[in-house]
Amino acid sequence: MRELFPKGRIVMNKKIAVIKGDGIGPEIVTEAMKVLDSVAKKFGHTFEYDRLLMGGCSIDANGVPLTDETIARAKAADAVLMGSIGGNTATSPWYKLPADKRPEAGLLKLRKSLNLFANLRPAVLYIELKNACPLKAEIADRGFDMMIMRELTGGLYFGARKTETVDGVVTATDTLTYNENEIRRIAIRAFDIAMKRRKKVTSVDKANVLDSSRLWRKIVEEVAKDYPEVSYEHMLVDNCAMQLVKDPAQFDVVLTENMFGDILSDEASMITGSIGMLASASLNDTKFGLYEPSGGSAPDIAGQNKANPIATILSAAMLLRYSFDMDNEADAVEAAVDKALKDGYRTGDIMSDGMKHVTCTGMGDVIAANI
């Protein structure tokens, strides 16, 4: 009798906290779960879903964007898969609340509660979608596949700040601080991830000006000694911003601090042509992570079956790879997305002449069937 699951395959039981969120969130997460179920069936795993509320839907149900119970249940899971949080800031009653009671405050609190410090944002240009890329054809034709790794908890955004009057002049001060431990842990994570990719790290800083960047560079060099298989380079942030549009194919893993990563990851996302294709992950110093699409809640198309679920499906692939060490399974999801695009299936945001238009559920069906 043929074995259903080949010898040597490790079968796992994993609990995934699922936060569908607001707007298009429930639709796109449902399709990602559909694909995960196909993975479980093919590879013999069991995925248990714990469905939680956060954001506007939690405000409506519980009066707050995030409850202590949701935090506890998220911590008890092996990973978190999330949709999108928030609504129309001009019309939604959620945005008449104080800032710390609005939907996005729940996400900030959850990230802090889960000790998430490393943000991963892949930027991939699929050859099938190269016409959507704003770069020159000769650049887009090469494609690119990079991972921006941004430190989330230190730097300018979390340093001491004040606004005061000095000698009659209003003066604002923000402090950029990093310690060696913060740098070391994000560098280790970057080199670990490079080992799963093309084994190259580009560390981005401003070491010609900033003391914090000089420390950053020193610690990265120390960490690199433990990864002889990984090539690495230092690049100044202004040069990196230029190289992203000049020759994005050169990058594999881009490691950088909080503010630089905030800016560079947005730049990298825009040259792909569609934010509906871009996954995201935030990790702590264990295997735990929160996985979500890079785009917003798109309330204008919510409930209309128009959303592109690919970013969320690719976020689920990242979950498999980085939290569960299921590289083969993650490869299968990414290959299934690739095949759907090669076969001409498109949601409205990436539609072009001659392609096959599908709904949100339609795209999920196609990708799940490709597993």
Residue ranges and their predicted role:
Residues R2-V11:
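Short, Lys/Arg-enriched N-terminal segments with co-localized hydrophobic residues
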Residues M12-I16:
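Extreme N-terminal starter segment of soluble prokaryotic enzymes
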Residues A17-K34, V39-A40, V166-D238, Q250:
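Glycine-rich phosphate/diphosphate-binding loop of Rossmann-like nucleotide-binding domains
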Residues D22-G25, D78, M149, A190, ...:
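Buried hydrophobic positions in well-ordered alpha/beta secondary-structure cores of metabolic enzymes
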Residues G44-D50, R197-D205, Y227-M235, D325-E334, ...:
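Flexible, glycine/charged-enriched surface loops at secondary-structure junctions
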Residues G44-D68, M242-L244:
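N-terminal beta-loop-helix "entrance" segment that forms/cooperates
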Residues G56, L244-Y345:
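Glycine-rich phosphate/nucleotide-binding loop
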Residues D60-T173, M259:
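N-terminal glycine-rich phosphate/adenylate-binding segment common to multiple enzyme folds
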